[in-house]
């Protein structure tokens, strides 16, 4: 019989744009997604602001970053910046 308790779920990763890096070791990331309207079928943009842990303060405003979900670090922060995909100009 297989023991499924040792297998971990794949970590959730999302991509977003840094809109604020004014806090120490924390960045605010805007994550945009498209949803389909139930009745009319038009695709609508929706966005969410998330706080992510940036231990080395490497991110700047406008950077596109890849984040992964982690155990809660603070009241509002449960994401960690994994890599900077694209730098802002």
Swiss-Prot record:
Any Gene Ontology biological process: translation
Pfam assignment, any one: Ribosomal_S17
Name the UniProt record assigns to this protein: Small ribosomal subunit protein uS17
Subunit structure: Part of the 30S ribosomal subunit.
Key words of the record: Ribonucleoprotein, Ribosomal protein, RNA-binding, rRNA-binding
GO cellular component, one term: cytosolic small ribosomal subunit
Disulfide bonds: none
Purpose of the protein: One of the primary rRNA binding proteins, it binds specifically to the 5'-end of 16S ribosomal RNA.
Gene3D superfamilies xref list: Nucleic acid-binding proteins
Similarity comment: Belongs to the universal ribosomal protein uS17 family.
SUPFAM superfamilies per record: Nucleic acid-binding proteins
Molecular functions per Gene Ontology: rRNA binding; structural constituent of ribosome
InterPro entries: NA-bd_OB-fold, Ribosomal_uS17, Ribosomal_uS17_bact/chlr
């Amino acid at each position: 019989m297989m023991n499924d308790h040792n297998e971990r779920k794949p970590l959730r990763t999302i991509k977003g744009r840094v809109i604020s890096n004014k806090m120490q070791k924390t960045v605010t990331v805007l994550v945009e997604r498209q949803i389909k309207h139930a009745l009319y079928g038009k695709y609508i943009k929706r966005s969410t602001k998330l706080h992510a842990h940036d231990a080395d303060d490497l991110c700047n405003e406008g950077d596109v970053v890849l984040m992964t979900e982690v155990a809660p670090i603070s009241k509002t922060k449960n994401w960690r910046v994994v890599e900077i995909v694209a730098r802002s100009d």
